[in-house]
């Protein structure tokens, strides 16, 4: 494989091309991209954990340093002002020398408010992208050039198409996350609490809680019915029934987002349902290809859910087609089949149909689907179907004409297991689909 430095060089060529195009379209001279600033907790003197501007880390793998600035015009070498204060209170990152620094002009910025003296005098035609518009106004950036929607829409749209460098980083993030999942399963099998399982995961991936791309979902038993469960009980339950882990990792600013579900026992209905969801997820991925709308795959999985509900006699005396048509599958899989993945976990532009930002909303029947784009080569997405037993979603079905089709006794028996989710990260190619997760032998 090409070195990361060679891949990065081509990555910058691609970003420069996109920059030239967007500057010409919106008649701008350059973009000033801000890494971000630290924000203190209200009435306190310590800051929230720093989260870098995604548009900044698209250019440089600098994810932990606030008060950095990047000036790009699509022609000249991108220029990075790297915040390098004299500070004995806090650690200071050294001026970077890495695989990527040959392609970027790196200049030390000793004072956070010192960027004004470094920029071109004429700034009326520079666009600012960042989280501190008041800072841009202080730098005499025109108000209408602060986070201009058209520019951001354009950049977001093309972020769906990953460069080879980005794909290489995402494969590395997968490796880290997979090692974490193995460690977490081992911790679960040994009877640990959610809190301790999370520590095992973080240790294996080399992350802190603030480093992971999203809060880890470490859910034992009925907690697996809470889609974004992040509480982390310190005490292990008296009986281990099930474990749902939705946890990722980050490499050079790019995310992995994986989910696995395990049954404590292998000889019950729940264990068989986990196996069947896994099999159907793999079967769906095998059908994926460029040129098909992501919405179609979401709808197809509801048909697969119907098949499983019927097989396991959770819904009875109703055809699979009627189940989907009347949305009896809805309470069992209330979220979308997945989402775009990249610099952000829920990566941008999932609904954009073109580089002008034309929006196509999710179908009204499936409002929580996060992507309506037609799949194209170089797109990276998650495929994460699930079946859950969530009382608040099932309750409305306990009355009315369809209630008789629900096997309430079976549902009550499965509720203590919470639910099931299986999530892989896939790359669309010209000639098929790459499953980055399964390629690393994560069962």
From Swiss-Prot:
EC number annotated for this UniProt entry: 3.4.13.9
Catalytic reaction annotation: Xaa-L-Pro dipeptide + H2O = an L-alpha-amino acid + L-proline
Molecular function terms from GO: aminopeptidase activity; metal ion binding; metalloexopeptidase activity; phosphoric triester hydrolase activity; proline dipeptidase activity
Alphabetic keyword roster: Dipeptidase, Hydrolase, Manganese, Metal-binding, Metalloprotease, Protease
PANTHER family cross-referenced by the UniProt entry: XAA-PRO AMINOPEPTIDASE 3 (PTHR43226), XAA-PRO DIPEPTIDASE (PTHR43226:SF8)
Similarity-based family: Belongs to the peptidase M24B family. Bacterial-type prolidase subfamily.
Name assigned to this protein: Xaa-Pro dipeptidase
């Amino acid at each position: 494989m090409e070195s990361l430095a060679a891949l990065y060089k081509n990555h910058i060529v691609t970003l420069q091309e996109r920059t030239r195009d967007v500057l010409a379209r919106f008649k701008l001279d350059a973009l000033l991209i801000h890494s971000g600033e630290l924000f203190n907790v209200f009435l306190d003197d310590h800051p929230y954990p720093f989260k870098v501007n995604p548009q900044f880390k698209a250019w440089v793998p600098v994810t932990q340093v606030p008060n950095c600035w990047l000036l790009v015009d699509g022609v000249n070498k991108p220029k990075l002002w790297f915040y390098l204060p004299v500070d004995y209170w806090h650690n200071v990152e050294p001026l970077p020398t890495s695989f990527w620094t040959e392609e970027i002009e790196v200049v030390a910025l000793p004072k956070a408010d010192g960027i004004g003296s470094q920029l071109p005098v004429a700034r009326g035609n520079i666009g600012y992208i960042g989280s501190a518009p008041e800072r841009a106004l202080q730098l005499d950036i025109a108000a209408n050039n602060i986070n201009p929607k058209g520019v951001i829409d354009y950049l977001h749209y093309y972020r769906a198409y990953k460069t080879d460098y980005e794909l290489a980083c995402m494969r590395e993030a997968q490796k880290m996350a997979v090692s974490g999942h193995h460690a977490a399963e081992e911790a679960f099998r040994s009877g640990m609490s959610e809190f301790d399982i999370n520590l095992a995961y973080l240790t294996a991936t080399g992350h802190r809680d603030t480093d992971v791309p999203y809060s880890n979902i470490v859910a034992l038993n009925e907690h697996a019915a809470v889609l974004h469960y992040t509480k982390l009980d310190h005490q292990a339950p008296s009986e281990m029934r099930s474990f749902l882990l939705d946890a990722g990792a980050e490499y050079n600013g790019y995310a992995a987002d994986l989910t696995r579900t395990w049954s404590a026992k292998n000889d019950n209905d729940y264990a068989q349902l986990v196996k069947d969801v896994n099999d159907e997820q793999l079967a769906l991925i095998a059908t994926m290809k460029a040129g098909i709308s992501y919405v179609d795959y979401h709808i197809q999985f509801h048909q697969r859910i119907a098949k499983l509900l019927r097989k396991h006699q959770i819904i009875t005396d109703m055809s699979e087609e009627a189940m989907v048509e009347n949305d009896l599958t809805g309470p069992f899989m209330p979220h979308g089949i997945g989402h775009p993945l990249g610099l952000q976990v829920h990566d941008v532009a999932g609904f954009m149909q073109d580089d002008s930002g034309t929006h196509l909303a999710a179908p009204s029947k499936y409002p929580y689907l996060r992507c309506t784009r037609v799949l194209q080569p170089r797109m990276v997405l998650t495929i994460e179907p699930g079946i859950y037993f969530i009382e608040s979603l099932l309750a409305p079905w306990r009355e009315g004409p369809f209630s008789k089709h629900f096997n309430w006794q079976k549902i009550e028996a499965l509720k203590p297991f919470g639910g099931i989710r299986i999530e892989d990260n896939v790359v669309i190619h010209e000639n098929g689909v790459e499953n980055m997760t399964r390629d690393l032998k994560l069962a």
